[in-house]
């Protein structure tokens, strides 16, 4: 067994027991990354920096100064600013941008002893559900349907993070989730991903898409690994005005905790048209597993669910059009010349932004314009409030909610890329938690008939990641999901 096959927890235990060093563990991952370049998961490899960080980690351990993630090699979604290391958001406009500061989330991981392997691919500015909008090309899912060589999407926007974890190219990865960008890729790649409560992780140093929806979180191999990473990533940050000043528990203590007596809500509105029978069956399996673990199953209603997707695709582009106004070619990033200032702006943005980003800027600018603001944007905000109220009402009946993560297994690269609506429908089960600011976790619970992974989602009350991890631990144990992508790369 290669060192790269280890879970994060097993690797940390092995390092603590002196079975191997961080340099050895890191080198094994660097070799795996080099062999897997065809997947395009990493858009920037930092092997020298990784070995340097690993050597320093081994030195700290020798002095008895090991942090909670000491010596563990991780991947970083290229939306997190990394001091002195190129950060692009996978756009042409930031192709050569090198930040002079470190995002809060990554600096906390390095503080706890983790090692950086490189920067991971994503949909441009985190806008997309298939990783096909990246300026650096799509990521290929390490999973393939049985008997097929067809390239599949790893999901998006955190496709690089999910593919790298699934292919054992890191022990865990940072990711972000604005409408499902952690959970849908996790479901497509047989990995675990959690979007915590809005404000649990600092957004400082994370390239902004939609500021009221964006939230950082980890993608990992197991529920326990995700809990380990989230514990390090969370915490109050005065540099982010939306960061919550509340204590962070050690989330790992809740994994494996009994769920006996918990009430699990099953929302009837999540039974959508054309949902594959396999996903419905998996949902029923999840219900049965939790019943066996001692949970009480409660039918609940989230009546405004059907408006969530349209509301999301008004609110998110509106915020994006505002956030992306800063890319003007003046202070940083790409600059295309022109005869006057307006022309420089136009040329820079026309050349620097990809089609999907332009589409969302146009939608956002339209819904914020005079005459349409009330009809679209204000209405979407009212719907958002109603969705949050639906959840508030549900919490009087249940402690957590169980749903599928995505309406399908991974689809082929290029299959939906010319149909934005079909692409947006990928988020049908995930956007509600972003609109309401709730924690949501996806974990792999089974394979479809083609041997592709399917995920279940657990949604929790605000700031109750503890219960989410307990329920996820129970589902993980019952599902016994150990399948890995067969290595073809």
Swiss-Prot record:
Keyword Metal-binding: no
GO biological process, one term: translation
Lineage: superkingdom: Bacteria
PROSITE patterns in UniProt: AMIDASES
Swiss-Prot/TrEMBL catalytic activity: L-glutamyl-tRNA(Gln) + L-glutamine + ATP + H2O = L-glutaminyl-tRNA(Gln) + L-glutamate + ADP + phosphate + H(+)
Cited SUPFAM superfamilies: Amidase signature (AS) enzymes
Disulfide bonds: none
A Gene Ontology cellular-component term: glutamyl-tRNA(Gln) amidotransferase complex
Keyword vocabulary terms for this entry: ATP-binding, Ligase, Nucleotide-binding, Protein biosynthesis
Enzyme active site: 77 (charge relay system), 157 (charge relay system), 181 (acyl-ester intermediate)
E.C. numbers: 6.3.5.7
Entry-linked InterPro entries: Amidase (IPR000120), Amidase_CS (IPR020556), Amidase_dom (IPR023631), AS_sf (IPR036928), GatA (IPR004412)
Gene Ontology terms for molecular function: ATP binding; glutaminyl-tRNA synthase (glutamine-hydrolyzing) activity
Role: Allows the formation of correctly charged Gln-tRNA(Gln) through the transamidation of misacylated Glu-tRNA(Gln) in organisms which lack glutaminyl-tRNA synthetase. The reaction takes place in the presence of glutamine and ATP through an activated gamma-phospho-Glu-tRNA(Gln).
HAMAP family membership: GatA
Subunit structure, as described in the record: Heterotrimer of A, B and C subunits.
Similarity remark: Belongs to the amidase family. GatA subfamily.
Name this polypeptide is given: Glutamyl-tRNA(Gln) amidotransferase subunit A
């Amino acid at each position: 067994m290669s060192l790269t096959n280890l879970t994060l927890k097993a690797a940390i235990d092995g390092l603590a027991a002196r079975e191997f060093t961080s340099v050895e563990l890191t080198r094994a991952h660097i070799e795996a990354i080099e062999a897997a370049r065809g997947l395009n998961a990493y858009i920037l490899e930092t092997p020298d920096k990784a070995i340097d960080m690993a050597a320093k980690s081994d030195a700290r351990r020798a002095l008895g100064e090991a942090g909670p993630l000491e010596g563990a090699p991780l991947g970083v979604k290229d939306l997190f600013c990394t001091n002195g290391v190129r950060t692009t958001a996978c756009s042409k406009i930031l192709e050569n941008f090198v930040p002079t500061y470190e995002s809060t989330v990554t600096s906390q991981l390095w503080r706890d002893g983790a090692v950086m392997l490189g920067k991971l691919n994503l949909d441009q500015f985190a806008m997309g559900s298939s990783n096909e909008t990246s300026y650096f090309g799509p990521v290929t899912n390490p999973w393939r349907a049985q008997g097929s060589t067809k390239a599949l999407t790893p999901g998006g926007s955190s496709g690089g993070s999910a593919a790298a974890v699934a292919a054992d190219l890191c022990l865990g990865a940072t990711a972000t989730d604005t409408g499902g960008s952690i959970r849908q890729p996790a479901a497509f790649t047989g990995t675990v991903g959690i979007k915590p409560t809005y404000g649990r992780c600092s957004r400082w140093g994370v390239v902004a898409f939609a500021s009221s929806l964006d939230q950082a979180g980890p993608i990992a191999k197991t529920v326990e690994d995700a809990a380990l990473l989230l514990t390090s990533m969370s915490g109050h940050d005065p540099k982010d005005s939306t960061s919550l000043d509340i204590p962070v528990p050690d989330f790992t203590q809740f994994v494996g905790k009994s769920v006996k007596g918990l009430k699990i809500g099953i929302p009837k509105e999540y039974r959508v048209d054309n949902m594959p029978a396999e996903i419905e069956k998996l949902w029923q399996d999840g219900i049965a597993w939790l019943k066996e673990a001692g949970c009480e199953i409660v039918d609940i209603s989230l009546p405004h669910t059907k408006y969530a997707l349209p509301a999301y695709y008004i609110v998110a582009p509106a915020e994006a059009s505002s956030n992306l106004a800063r890319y003007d070619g003046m202070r940083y990033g790409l600059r295309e010349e022109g005869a006057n200032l307006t022309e420089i702006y136009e040329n820079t943005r026309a050349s620097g932004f990809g089609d999907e980003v332009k589409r969302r800027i146009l939608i956002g600018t339209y819904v914020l314009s005079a005459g349409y603001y009330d009809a679209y944007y204000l209405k979407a905000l009212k719907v958002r409030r109603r969705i949050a109220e639906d959840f508030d009402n549900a919490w009087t009946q249940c402690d957590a909610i169980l749903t599928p993560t995505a309406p399908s297994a991974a689809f082929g690269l290029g299959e939906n890329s010319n149909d934005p609506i079909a692409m947006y429908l990928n988020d049908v089960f995930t956007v509600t938690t972003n609109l309401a600011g709730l924690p949501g976790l996806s974990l792999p619970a089974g394979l479809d008939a083609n041997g592709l992974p399917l995920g279940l989602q657990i949604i929790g009350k605000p700031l109750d990641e503890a219960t989410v991890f307990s329920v996820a631990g129970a589902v993980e144990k019952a599902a016994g999901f150990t399948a890995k992508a067969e290595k073809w790369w």
